[in-house]
């Protein structure tokens, strides 16, 4: 009986002792928490997972503590804000204790740590459960390298801007990255200007939907192998390779672009590309090609015969500054939904042959600078162009200095308000018949025909100019033009006639007898250099508001 009682007592004591011993251990385990300490004096930030938070003497943040940006975005409390960035911390340390913590997100953890140069103990960052790495190293300007070889990324879905603006990074080893679940790679390497190479051969991009600006301004990259990229689910490739000026070739033969809607600026500024094969691109869902090939200054040819542009609405600057492109056949282009053709072929300086026979321009509202400075074009047949919605033709043919033939016979200009410099420096054009132009809504005709030195025939007698305010330099240096019929011009709202006929060297007669000049303030150099004019009728001129008549008749030797 005594032995039984003794055993029972011992057992109870043993259980009690175990419970009493376990209790503080459980309390200890429960009190562990993840947090960050900033030591401003030492310029170090340390990540811990322990129960010593209260004893830390630096600035301490709980791992889930947040701050709001001006836009309302919640980011870690220790992150750099959008205005100033974090300009103190030069070193980040992951304490060994932190390896037992499993974060589910590391988004914005080091965002805008602009002077951060070292990450120590990063192997203690356990990323097994992380799903979001968005903006993790965003704007870490001074970071020269980062070892991510231990990163487990198999659960990550978001890598948006992960290394964006890490301008000092010269190399990046992502060979261990598992990206099979990633859907967002938007701006992932944006502005990584120091990277000269990037091996992404192991990347699984099957689920990626967004590749917008992925390599934006990676100016140091000289090569990029994307032959294994699966892009079947990608919808956005806008500015994907923008200003990757060091890349000389791109193999995109495996790209599936069937779901892509945005190709805006996709290759813009790729000035090193000498060739580009996009013949297999499926563009049936693309709505914007704004600046798609702009400033591809080394491209000499481009085959777009397979492009389906039926849904495209924006072709603004699509080929602008393709300064080595000699010929372009866009006969297959369907432009029925395009509304913007601003600067579409601007500064294609050696483009001698351009085929646009089937362009439907009935929805286009802007043709501003569309062919500006296309200096090699000698003829342009735009007879298919119907322009009922166009409001601006400013500088449309400006600088087309080799143009001798221009067919714009079907232009509808009823809604055009701006013809500023429309034919500026079309110095080889011998004649222009604009008798069909409806200019009722035009307010600006500044330098409209300036430097059209070869013009010998110009039909503008039907122009309705009642709303025009600026006619300065309108016929400046039309040095071969013998006469002008402006008898129908209504100038009641014109305020500026400065240099309007300056250097019309062959002009013998200009009928300005019906000009209403009561609102004109500037007549500086208006007839300067009109050396063959013998008479001018100013009987209706009202110069009460004119403040400048300097050199108005300079070198008018025959008057």
Where do the protein language model's features map onto the residues?
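Register-specific detector for alpha-helical tandem repeat solenoids, activating on a conserved position
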Residues: 107, 134-135, 160-161, 186-187, ...
């Amino acid at each position: 009986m005594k032995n039984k009682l003794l055993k029972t007592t011992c057992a109870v004591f043993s259980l009690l002792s175990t419970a009493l011993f376990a209790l503080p251990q459980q309390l200890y385990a429960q009190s562990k928490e993840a947090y960050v300490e900033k030591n401003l004096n030492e310029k170090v930030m340390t990540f811990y997972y322990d129960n010593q938070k209260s004893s830390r003497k630096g600035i301490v943040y709980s791992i889930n503590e947040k701050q709001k940006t001006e836009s309302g975005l919640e980011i870690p409390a220790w992150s750099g804000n959008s205005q100033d960035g974090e300009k103190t911390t030069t070193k980040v340390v992951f304490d060994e204790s932190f390896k037992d913590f499993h974060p589910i997100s590391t988004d914005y953890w080091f965002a805008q740590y602009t002077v951060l140069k070292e990450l120590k103990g990063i192997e203690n960052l356990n990323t097994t459960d992380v799903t979001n790495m968005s903006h993790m190293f965003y704007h870490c300007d001074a970071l020269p390298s980062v070892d991510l070889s231990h990163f487990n990324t198999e659960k990550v879905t978001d890598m948006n801007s992960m290394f964006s603006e890490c301008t000092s990074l010269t190399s990046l080893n992502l060979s261990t990255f598992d990206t099979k679940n990633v859907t967002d790679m938007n701006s992932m390497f944006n502005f990584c200007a120091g990277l000269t190479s990037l091996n992404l051969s192991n990347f699984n991009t099957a689920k990626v939907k967004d590749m917008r600006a992925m390599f934006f301004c990676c100016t140091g990259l000289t090569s990029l192998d994307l032959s294994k990229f699966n892009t079947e689910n990608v919808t956005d490739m806008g500015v994907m390779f923008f200003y990757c000026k060091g890349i000389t070739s791109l193999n995109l033969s495996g790209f599936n672009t069937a779901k892509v809607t945005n190709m805006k600026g996709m290759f813009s500024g790729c000035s090193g590309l000498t060739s580009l094969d996009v013949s297999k691109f499926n563009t049936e869902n693309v709505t914007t090609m704004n600046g798609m090939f702009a400033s591809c200054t080394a491209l000499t040819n481009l085959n777009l015969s397979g492009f389906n542009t039926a849904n495209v609405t924006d072709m603004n600057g699509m080929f602008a500054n393709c300064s080595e492109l000699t010929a372009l056949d866009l006969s297959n282009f369907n432009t029925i939904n395009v509304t913007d053709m601003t600067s579409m072929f601007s500064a294609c300086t050696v483009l001698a042959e351009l085929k646009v026979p089937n362009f439907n321009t009935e929805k286009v509202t802007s043709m501003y600078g569309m062919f500006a400075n296309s200096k090699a074009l000698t003829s342009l047949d735009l007879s298919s162009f119907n322009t009922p919605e166009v409001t601006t033709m400013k500088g449309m043919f400006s600088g087309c200095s080799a143009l001798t033939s221009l067919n714009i016979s079907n232009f509808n200009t009823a809604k055009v308000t701006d013809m500023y410099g429309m034919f500026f420096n079309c110095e080889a054009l011998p004649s222009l018949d604009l008798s069909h132009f409806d200019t009722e809504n035009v307010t600006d005709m500044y330098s409209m025909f300036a430097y059209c030195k070869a013009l010998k025939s110009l039909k503008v007698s039907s122009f309705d100019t009642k709303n025009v305010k600026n006619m300065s330099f309108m016929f400046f240096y039309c040095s071969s033009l013998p006469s002008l019929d402006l008898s129908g011009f209504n100038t009641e709202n014109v305020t500026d006639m400065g240099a309007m006929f300056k250097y019309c060297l062959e002009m013998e007669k200009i009928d300005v007898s019906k000009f209403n000049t009561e609102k004109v303030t500037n007549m500086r150099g208006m007839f300067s250099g009109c050396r063959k004019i013998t008479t001018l009728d100013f009987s209706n001129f009202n110069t009460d508001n004119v403040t400048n008549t300097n050199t108005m008749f300079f070198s008018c030797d025959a008057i």
